[in-house]
Amino acid sequence: MSDNDTIVAQATPPGRGGVGILRISGLKAREVAETVLGKLPKPRYADYLPFKDADGSVLDQGIALWFPGPNSFTGEDVLELQGHGGPVILDLLLKRILTIPGLRIARPGEFSERAFLNDKLDLAQAEAIADLIDASSEQAARSALNSLQGAFSARVNHLVEALTHLRIYVEAAIDFPDEEIDFLSDGKIEAQLNDVIADLDAVRAEARQGSLLREGMKVVIAGRPNAGKSSLLNALAGREAAIVTDIAGTTRDVLREHIHIDGMPLHIIDTAGLREASDEVERIGIERAWQEIEQADRVLFMVDGTTTDAVDPAEIWPEFIARLPAKLPITVVRNKADITGETLGMSEVNGHALIRLSARTGEGVEVLRNHLKQSMGFDTNMEGGFLARRRHLQALEQAAEHLQQGKAQLLGAWAGELLAEELRLAQQNLSEITGEFTSDDLLGRIFSSFCIGK
């Protein structure tokens, strides 16, 4: 297998459909066109042609599109064959193409990888292709498209350019120490550095929003049996996703619902009631509940308001609170307010949010929805946003740390060499986002998560 091979793959989902597309990219794409179509189509024009087998018989007929490199998606010669979407027809056509020497099936994401390697896309744009396909909401799709069109990359490149100018100024101060003006102490470098830090903070805020849109927030509903966990899941999902009975231990396994609150994706997880298990099945369910709790972004601690007047989670169930991960955010949900007569709404107890509601009637559930949105810092009014991945957030955080350390060197010790090094490292972190500075191992991991025909 070589990166110089001509590659072919089905670009449409497997299964039956009205249209099926095969995509070919590489030096032998021209030969495929001449062999299968009998001619080379006019560049960038749709040509309706028969697709022929080796013996000249017609396998299918459809649209052929020819994109000679470098003016194509991958930067190579690209041929697209758009025929009927039957799996048998597509398989026959694929087998016919693979009889031509030098062709092979593409690896997952290899078309996008070649586009990146041929400078048709930067790495953030290439990742946005997969994110656009996987988008679970309109807002996520729009943000992914913004990233694909270069919105995220433009912000990052602006920061890199600003750091380049700043590094030039700092290096000049280091290389010409005998000048009458002390470049490190004249205030200009500090002002420029503060501007870069402010711009980076703005990008980080948008990236966190973009990460929420892409990854979603994992919220686990946990508590004792019959506290109303499944009723709350149904109320948040807007449908009867979980069976609800008065029998303790009805929920034996983990139930998952994917919902959206004003565009923010949430993974809501209902778990088995936590208690001493009465049988092996319940014990396994409780173990799985704890596994989900340990991986959660937030826990909704469900409390049956008819069983206790306590509002402090440490007082309600100290053993449960003691077992939770130290930094895991908790929201105490006092359920059955329709029975207890408690005032609906949200308050705070010892640093924990407390919400009183009725999962059965739905009263107070909207307060919980708004709380979940606000607790993750999700802004529904942010326009022109972009999607971001965890690696993007890590790179931005590391760049911010280096800039703060560089500022400390500037203000504390006037150490130009150390400041220059911190600026270089920050620039390197930012360049990792667009792929200007990226290891081959990372590229492999990124593109292997793509669809075969992308």
Swiss-Prot record:
Record-level GO cellular component terms: cytosol
Cofactor: K(+)
UniProt keyword list: Cytoplasm, GTP-binding, Hydrolase, Magnesium, Metal-binding, Nucleotide-binding, Potassium, tRNA processing
Cofactor binding note: Binds 1 potassium ion per subunit.
TrmE-type G domain ranges (all copies): 216-377
Gene Ontology terms, MF aspect: GTP binding; GTPase activity; metal ion binding
Major subcellular location class: cytoplasm
Domain of life: Bacteria
Keyword Membrane: no
Positions bound to GTP: 226-231, 245-251, 270-273, 335-338, 358-360
Assembly with partners or alone: Homodimer. Heterotetramer of two MnmE and two MnmG subunits.
PANTHER family, alphabetized: TRNA MODIFICATION GTPASE GTPBP3, TRNA MODIFICATION GTPASE GTPBP3, MITOCHONDRIAL
Family named by the database record: Belongs to the TRAFAC class TrmE-Era-EngA-EngB-Septin-like GTPase superfamily. TrmE GTPase family.
Function field: Exhibits a very high intrinsic GTPase hydrolysis rate. Involved in the addition of a carboxymethylaminomethyl (cmnm) group at the wobble position (U34) of certain tRNAs, forming tRNA-cmnm(5)s(2)U34.
Protein name per UniProt: tRNA modification GTPase MnmE
